[in-house]
Curated annotation (Swiss-Prot):
The modification Phosphoserine is found at residue 500. Residues 1-32, 652-675, 813-871, 924-984 are annotated as: Disordered. Keywords: Phosphoprotein. This is FHIP family protein GJ17503. Belongs to the FHIP family. Pfam families: DUF5917 (PF19314), KELAA (PF19311), RAI16-like (PF10257). Transmembrane segments: none annotated. It comes from Drosophila virilis (Fruit fly). Residues 16-26, 816-838, 955-978 have a biased composition (Low complexity). Residues 1-15, 839-857, 929-954 have a biased composition (Polar residues).
Length: 1048
């Protein structure tokens, strides 16, 4: 209650206290001179006498005839201030307010009892209504008094008419009024306290319902608080007073929204509240229109200051005031949907869809300008990651799939088209948005993106469909993925193993082609950074997740389990089933007759059918079985003769029924071949050809499409070696998220190398083979290649540590340094404001600079050109400190690449500037890494976008090597828009900051071996190697999940 000591009227009234005729007692004078606490010594009798005397003097002023003068108002306010102080002292010494009864002992709170018995509050209100221009000053003191009494007495006083009646009067008179800020603050605080009390005492809700204004005045004057007559419009006075402050900024808006949420929660307990809010209040349209207005104030173009920026993070929200206000309003709408009555919830969802989502978000996303598209999709991604209520989420999903609101064009289709964009920033933002959409585990979205193209099974040849639900091939898929590792990465893995491990290699492995080809290749000089702190290919000794297969398995298990729990709530299982339900037998009888007639005509028309020999009949059967895959990419693949004769179970596909029908029309087929496909005579007549569409399945397999979404992903994957590093990180993360779904139909595309895919584009496994062949051809196993591979590997690991440390330093920054940064942001100098907004730990990218992670930049994580040594703390500060935009822009005009040349020079010592004066830098880097070992969060190398809560291995605050940092809650954050704020800057150390992934030149560009193309391929090889390990881990975990399902 700081207002007791810093009241705006206390100082002005001090001079007039003697002339006002107030005789102050010694106890009151003592109380005014020191703070009030529980240990304050006071005489209860003296306090009571002083309280009564102050009221008598105030009452004398109130009884003066004529309008109140300035001195009269000051005198009453002064006496009222003293009375509040005495009441506060009394209530501090009362553990509980106990109102007197007829046979009770003397009251424990005599001042409070006198206040109620003499109707002081009512008399004070009546006099305040006549003060004219001084009404706000008197009202402010009244609100302070009510706030004090409500906060200390809770609900006890609300039950008594001498307190409730003037409270209702002052609240009713506040409707429709415009008050100064200090009065608004006191009013909202009082309303918030009343909501808290009502939430704990629901039976008091009826005390705050009023009828029309005229009827309210009549009830108050008559002293009756009876319920209003039927048919009159009710008014929840507390809720009505809070509505104008719902979109206010600062603490006032927060308190008003908190109080409104309590009212919404009360609607669940009292249906009258819910009916009133839904039918008679304007809260729902006010929320939606305010949300649309706040969205229109958002920046139409986001300044991208980082090469790997792809989404808005919580740090960005706090740095952009307009975005902060919008997110506050959105989170409030989400909370209302969560706690409000069903009528309020449904009304708000309808207004949200018709008043904000469709008319505001729709046109924003469909803009043609690339910068506007990036910003609109980033805002949509942030919205989807922020809302948690299923009802609100369904509204956004409906928006993405709606075909009627935008001239027949779906928003989802427009987003898929942007995956083909050559602009790297737009492509990364789009993939980040789809990563969020896939992370929702929404059945409708998955059906539109993938499942409706896969459910017919036409992407799988007829002879392979019985393999879809089998489990054993998943283990072979693991070996398949590991075999796709580029040869140069296999050689690098062998060289990274300890010598004792290399000596124990199986002699039979010497006959392998790679072992024969590389017996005389000299071992290159590996990176100087290989040590106990980093792990390589199974030897996990550090904090990096590089090559940590155990971490991949653990993460895959957690992600698959979460996805399985969410998908278990779907309306359909989306399992490929050969046998239809029994209820569909009669409905499909006509289709069966047409199928039999087709086979009969096909057999009679064939020239070889007349021969009647068993050999020709068997050959005809084989040719019919191969029709489904004759025009695809697997048409020339050799198949064993008994491949189609594997055991059949209830999950086999239409290959069984097709062969059974062919058996009915070919009496010359051998008995052995015939019996292997026979089910039984009793069930053969019930077989239905549910999956065989003769017009499309038999003759048009080569034109089967997997859908625009998968086609866009596959086309992006085919250009893997020419994409930027960050696009590839998001691409691999998106495909990995698809592989987490426990759906065999999706596994047939991603995790089943034994299933041939017949489509109009190369299959996923064929693309992986092509990537391996391309890397092996352009990056042969040689000493130079291995050196570049080591540089690329070291660059990615070092980048992982730098991102994690940057996030950690931001989280651990001292509060006073954050306060200094806030002061810089609120400075009045326009030049300083511009510099404060433009400073970032990320280097500013020129708009004309291609976003390509090529190893030709002069990036150096520590300044190597300085002659003097620096301490460890200064080196860390230099790494994460800020730099002016002008210097960054100047350097960007000289170089723009990924930075592997400087990293390579740093690790191998090839640059001429490293020959001296660098011991201090090396030790600083080693110490900085050693400092980060204990607390460095583990991250995933190959999967950049992450959104769910992390497991014990993958921490929730981690940042992936793709540049996305994990969120601290259920939603996920990524690298910040304006960079990571460093808390290590000091006034005496003015070093230029270094970007985490800077493309700016920061010294002499080191000469490295190999071309730019080879260095790009090295990055792709390292990333592909890690991604294949992750896919292998997912295949293993999916097999365990499927086995568990069958056992259960």
């Amino acid at each position: 209650m700081s207002w007791l000591r810093t009241s705006p009227l206390r100082q002005s009234l001090t001079r007039n206290s003697g002339s006002s005729g107030s005789g102050n007692s010694s106890a009151t004078t003592t109380l005014r001179q020191r703070p009030i606490d529980a240990a304050t010594d006071c005489d209860p009798r003296a306090c009571y006498d002083s309280f009564c005397k102050h009221w008598q003097q105030a009452h004398e002023i109130i009884q003066h005839p004529g309008p109140p003068t300035h001195d009269d108002v000051l005198g009453v306010v002064s006496h009222l201030d003293y009375m509040v102080t005495l009441l506060l002292v009394e209530l501090h010494h009362c553990n509980k307010v106990s109102l007197p009864t007829a046979d009770s002992a003397p009251p424990a709170a005599p001042c409070l009892e006198y206040l109620l018995s003499e109707n002081l509050l009512d008399k004070l209100y009546e006099w305040a209504s006549t003060t004219g221009r001084y009404a706000n000053a008197v009202r402010l003191e009244q609100l302070k008094l009510y706030e004090l009494l409500v906060s200390h007495s809770r609900h006890q006083l609300l039950c008594h008419e001498p307190f409730l009646r003037p409270l209702l009067k002052i609240l009713a008179s506040s409707q429709g009024e415009i008050f100064p800020p200090d009065l608004e603050k006191r009013l909202v605080i009082l309303l918030n306290q009343l909501c808290v009390v009502l939430m704990q005492n629901v039976h008091l809700l009826d005390l705050f319902f009023f009828s029309a204004q005229t009827q309210v005045q009549e009830q108050i004057q008559n002293g009756s608080l009876a319920a209003p007559k039927s048919g009159t419009t009710t008014n929840f006075i507390i809720f009505s007073l809070l509505i104008p402050y719902v979109h206010r900024e600062g603490s006032l808006g927060h308190q008003a929204r908190d109080a409104l949420l309590l009212c919404m929660a009360l609607s669940q307990k009292n249906s009258n509240i819910g009916h009133y809010i839904a039918q008679y209040s304007s809260i729902c349209p006010l929320l939606v229109t305010g949300l649309g207005g706040l969205y229109s104030r958002l920046p139409n173009s986001i300044e991208i200051s980082s090469i790997d920026w792809h989404r808005i993070t919580p740090d960005d929200v706090t740095e952009i005031p307009e975005l902060t206000l919008f997110m506050n309003a959105l989170e409030f709408c989400n909370a209302v949907v969560q706690v409000a009555h069903e009528m309020i919830k449904q009304q708000l969802l309808d207004f949200m869809y018709q008043g904000f989502i469709v008319p505001v978000l729709g046109p924003a996303i469909l803009q043609t300008n690339i910068d506007s598209q990036i910003s609109a999709m980033s805002y949509l991604d942030l919205i989807l990651r922020s809302i948690t209520e299923p009802g609100l989420m369904r509204a956004f999903v409906k928006f993405l799939l709606d075909t009627e609101k935008f001239d027949g064009e779906r928003i989802l289709d427009a987003l898929v088209e942007r995956l083909h964009s050559p602009d790297a920033n737009l492509c990364m933002v789009t993939m980040a948005l789809f990563d969020t959409l896939l992370g929702l585990h929404c059945e409708d979205l998955m059906l539109e993106l993938l499942l409706k193209y896969l459910l017919p099974g036409k992407h799988v040849p007829i002879s392979h469909r019985h393999k879809i639900n089998k489990i054993d091939p998943y283990l072979n898929t693991t070996e398949f993925f590991l075999d796709l590792t580029p040869d140069v990465m296999k050689r690098a893995r062998d060289l990274a193993r300890p010598k004792s491990v290399q000596d124990q290699v199986d002699p039979a492995a010497a006959t392998a082609p790679l072992a024969v080809m590389l017996p005389s290749l000299p071992s290159p000089v590996m990176s100087k950074t290989i040590g106990a702190n980093w792990n390589y290919y199974g030897h996990y000794t550090g904090d990096s997740l590089y090559a940590n297969v155990q971490a991949y398995l653990f993460e895959a298990h957690s992600r698959i389990a979460q996805c399985q729990r969410d998908c278990a709530k779907w309306a359909n299982s989306y399992r490929y089933q050969k046998w239809p339900r029994q209820g569909q037998a009669r409905a499909n009888a006509h289709a069966l007759e047409l199928a039999k007639q087709f086979f009969s005509e096909f057999a009679s028309a064939a020239p070889m059918a007349a021969a009647g020999t068993s050999d020709l009949g068997e050959k005809q059967l084989d040719s019919l079985q191969s029709i489904g895959e004759s025009s695809g990419y697997e048409s020339f693949k050799w198949r064993p003769a008994d491949e189609d004769a594997e055991g059949i179970d209830v999950t086999t596909t239409t290959a069984t029924s097709d062969t059974d029908l062919e058996h009915n029309n070919s009496s010359s087929i051998g008995s052995g071949r015939r019996d292997s496909w026979r089910i039984s005579h009793s069930t053969r007549n019930e077989l239905l050809l549910t999956d065989l569409d003769f017009s499309e399945d038999l003759f048009a397999q080569g034109t089967v499409s997997l859908g625009p979404f998968l086609n866009a992903i596959w086309s992006k994957l085919q250009t893997f070696t020419s994409n930027s590093l960050y696009v590839n990180l998001h691409l691999t993360g998106l495909i990995t998220r698809l592989a987490w779904y426990p759906l065999p139909l999706i596994h047939s595309l991603l995790l089943r190398s034994d299933i041939a895919i017949t489509s109009d584009t190369p299959s996923f496994h064929q693309v992986l083979r092509m990537l391996k062949q391309q890397i092996d051809a352009e990056l042969p196993v040689a000493e130079n290649s291995l050196e570049i591979i080591d540089v690329a590997r070291s660059y990615l690991i070092d980048r992982e540590f730098r991102l994690v440390n940057a996030r950690k330093i931001t989280d651990n920054a001292p509060m006073h340094q954050q306060h200094q940064q806030q002061q810089l942001q609120h400075t009045t100098n326009p030049t300083q404001q511009q510099q404060a907004q433009q400073r970032s730990t990320y280097a500013t990218l020129s708009a004309a600079t291609p976003v390509q992670a090529s190893p030709t930049s002069a990036y150096d994580p520590f300044r190597r050109s300085d002659n003097k040594r620096r301490s460890i703390s200064k080196s860390i500060s230099s790494m994460f400190s800020r730099r002016s935009t002008s210097s960054t822009a100047a350097t960007n005009t000289n170089t723009a690449s990924s930075g592997l040349s400087q990293i390579y020079a740093f690790f191998t010592g090839a640059a001429s500037t490293l020959v001296g004066g660098n011991n201090g830098e090396v030790s600083a880097r080693g110490a900085a890494q050693e400092q980060s070992r204990g607390n460095t969060c583990e991250t995933s190398l190959s999967t950049a976008p992450r959104q769910e809560a992390q497991t014990a291995v993958v921490s929730s605050s981690n940042s992936s090597i793709g540049g996305s940092t994990q969120t601290l809650s259920a939603t996920h954050s990524s690298s910040t828009l304006h960079g990571v704020e460093s808390g290590l800057q000091t006034g005496s150390f003015n070093s230029e900051p270094v970007s985490l992934d800077s493309v700016a030149s920061m010294g002499i560009i080191a000469n490295t071996s190999g071309t730019e193309r080879s260095r790009d391929l090295a990055l792709c090889a390292v990333l592909l190697d890690e991604w294949l390990k992750e896919l292998a881990a997912i295949a293993l975990e999916q097999s365990v999940v499927l086995v568990t399902e069958q056992l259960l």
